[in-house]
């Protein structure tokens, strides 16, 4: 059917008007998008300029480059190997493939990485010194590379663990995995719920020693031995990545713990994460982008398992080493109170952290058992616990770098903000904890490649004695900004990073570095030039 001329003409006119409107709207939207992008870029540049001004323009180039992507696509960070090449003065990292391979191998500590570096330099006259300088430069680059872009730590980890070709074009698989993460996690959690309960119980029995076919009580920790001495609760505290494991190794060499260690109960929430059946099931699938979420999924269950093991060990009068951040004051205070009274009254798990419908918060992590103390003769034979505290602090940017590198190697990661919060909270709480314990020590692990330094100590009722210079580390950490995106935003006064004694100043900004970099770059050019081309 043919439409009347007037109606058809009117329709064409309306379509034309609509087309013009759509065109104008599109142009307006495009202009707005361009303006927003430009404003965002200006803000980014201004932020970088402000950071550069606070630190000095000489080290602005230290920050990794970021390749901006279209809206909805994550940005690509400069790859670590390319970053190393740029720090050594090479404009095109693709011209130095062997160097890039060595840098990645060192970052991930792949098998034989040190032998590969030695082989790479074998024809150089100054082979030994170049070997040392190259590894030192790798270490500097690891520290500086991980001192920026903290909100993109998940992207950074995934990129480091993926092939370079995988980063050029985002795969459909990546989008699908991200979109289905919640459903996948829920399915695995549901399927393994019962198995997890049994597995966690078995793990607790293994750690406590009850599952052994031989009696687990020895002269060191049995109630008979406690007639001669009190059992010991050692609290190892410090932010994530502070270096607690390093300090604990030294403590195990001390006369008391060298004998008591074998029968002591060592409690660490992270250890329960690694044995959690749900965590292992998800981690075994090798999805790098799931790493942070997987650790977060089992965080509460691993914390509960550690708390359950703690109360069991204290009820038995065992020597206990509690290894954790100790960053949540109510939890630590209740733990110490329980340890003070457990020789008189047994305890059990409490309800934990609860928020009522009205918004009221209650925290009850442990509670006394209902039965009378007199009914338990064994409990009356125990001596009061001696409670010792060993704290570990370091500049938080060092801990972030350690944490991300550890994530690359053990495939277990944490977000940077909670990590920074754990450092700040522990630093603020440490003086309060010292008043609640019988003995306290504080170590600083800022020395790169060096041993931990004892910077504060307290024994008995004495006041906390401190090293007046080194205690500044605790003060800095107590005032850090947990929302920092980079090292430049970490402390209220960024200029302290460039002062003598600062790791950043003494390791990264060391005056001899440009000369060493020149020697390395000259040698690398010779070596790469002599390499056969593919």
UniProtKB/Swiss-Prot annotation:
Observed effect of gene inactivation: No visible phenotype under normal growth conditions.
Top-level EC class as recorded in UniProt: transferase
Regions annotated as coiled coil: none
Highest taxon of source: Eukaryota
Gene Ontology process terms (BP): NADP biosynthetic process
Membrane-crossing segments per the record: none
Subcellular location per the Swiss-Prot or TrEMBL entry: Mitochondrion outer membrane
Stated name of the protein: Calmodulin calcium-dependent NAD kinase
Catalyzed reaction equations: NAD(+) + ATP = ADP + NADP(+) + H(+)
Region Calmodulin-binding, residue ranges: 167-196
Assembly and oligomerization: Interacts with calmodulin (CaM) in a calcium Ca(2+)-dependent manner in vitro.
A Pfam family this chain is assigned to: Zeta_toxin
One Gene Ontology cellular component: mitochondrial outer membrane
Gene Ontology molecular function, alphabetical: ATP binding; calmodulin binding; NAD+ kinase activity
Membrane topology recorded in Swiss-Prot or TrEMBL: Peripheral membrane protein
Taxonomic placement: Eukaryota, Viridiplantae, Streptophyta, Embryophyta, Tracheophyta
Binding site for ATP: 238-245
